[in-house]
């Protein structure tokens, strides 16, 4: 019985201590929030630096003229040592790029790399590419990249692609990066068009 009373007293004392600490913390809530925001900012800076270092990233050079020049870019989610680097140039002589090639030739990965690099760069991240790579400032990035290639779903896949394309065309501006993979693919399931 005495042990139970001591345990109850201990709980009451713990509650008093926690109440006092809570009141002290409440008096400094603005300082605590400021410190927390500072730590979050520092953590973000260190995370960006760690990412840049681990992927041998470089700071992209930004322009507002629509020029993109990615030199030896490597998709950040693929194994560093097995990725074939890609060079992508747009905006100087042309602003449309059509990529053709065999299946598993890297077309989709190149599109995804361009989209990711654009978003990463504008978020203040370094990109896994050579120094001197240039990116343009965009107001939006739209992508219709169909990773699903099921013949049974060809009609619904095609309809989905068309809906995405209509949405993109209605919302794109001259400063929008639009990425389309296998545009018009899946129109005839027997052909397996890509």
Describe the function of each predicted region:
Residues 1-30, 64, 82-84, 92-96:
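Switch/coupling subdomain of P-loop NTPase systems
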Residues 2, 6, 28-31, 35-38, ...:
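Amphipathic alpha-helix face/heptad-repeat signature
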Residues 7-10, 14, 43-46, 72, ...:
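A structural signal for well-ordered alpha-helices, especially hydrophobic packing surfaces
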Residues 55-56, 63-194:
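ATPase nucleotide-binding head domains, primarily ABC-like/P-loop NTPase cores
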């Amino acid at each position: 019985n005495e042990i139970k009373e001591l345990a109850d007293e201990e709980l009451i004392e713990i509650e008093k201590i926690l109440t006092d600490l809570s009141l002290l913390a409440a008096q400094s809530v603005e300082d605590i929030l400021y410190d927390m925001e500072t730590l979050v900012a520092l953590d973000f800076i260190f995370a960006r630096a760690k990412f840049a270092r681990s992927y041998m990233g470089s700071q992209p050079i930004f322009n507002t003229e629509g020029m993109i020049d990615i030199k030896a870019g490597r998709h950040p989610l693929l194994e560093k040592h097995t990725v074939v680097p890609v060079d992508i140039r747009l905006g100087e002589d042309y602003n449309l790029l059509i990529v053709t090639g065999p299946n598993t030739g890297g077309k989709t990965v190149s599109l995804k790399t361009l989209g990711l690099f654009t978003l990463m760069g504008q978020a203040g991240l370094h990109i896994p590419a050579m120094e001197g790579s240039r990116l343009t400032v965009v107001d939006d990035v739209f992508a219709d990249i169909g990773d699903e290639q099921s013949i049974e779903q060809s009609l619904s896949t095609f309809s989905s692609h068309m809906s995405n394309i209509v949405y993109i065309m209605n919302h794109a501006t001259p400063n929008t990066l639009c990425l389309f993979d296998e545009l018009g693919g899946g129109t005839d399931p027997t052909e397996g068009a890509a």
